[in-house]
Amino acid sequence: EDIELIALSHFHPDHSAELPAILWPSGSQARLSGPTGDAGFPSVAEFLERLFGKNGAFPVFADRVQFDVLTVDTASRDIVDVWNVSDFLVRGIGVPHANVPTIGYRVDVGDASIAFSSDQNGSDPSFIEFIQDVDVLVIHMTVGEDASGFGADLHAKPSVWGQMATQGEVGRVLVSHISTPSPQVLQTRLGVLRDNYSGPVTVGEDLLCLEVN
């Protein structure tokens, strides 16, 4: 009942598979945002229909939840107001994640701001403009500096994250979506990040609370 908005970035399973479990206890109405589709991936409206429609995977939702859906055109790179209530503003923009339609988000609440990179390779300078001067940038530390091929097309290297944070003049970087189980590998990647960004870096963990001001 406390969830006002579910902002979906893209439709890889690790970013969308838990949606039925999140919505199951609440019922009634759900406000969601998500990407446009393409030949390989559904739009947010198509995704919801395939999951919750009368002929979907969970047809029990068809009469249980009413969806209020906003679609962000990820191909245009235009900034879209996703939710604007009082002093709470959520905006989305398309970001480059290989061939996957993907949204990065920015949340401004009063004077505080947080940006969520989502999965992306960091090749579009419009995202740096989008995150300018945020208090916290949440990044996905998924590949190392030696990434190549399709992996590098999907995900930004640690040096790229650092350069983006520096150019965006962000107040703090919060590292999430950590793919390696090795503490040594993680420290190496964090070292490259810090070589390219001089601000504070926090490594995310379950139940972490971070003050934003």
Task: State the predicted function of each range.
Residues 1-114, 191-194, 200-212:
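Binuclear metal-dependent hydrolase catalytic cores
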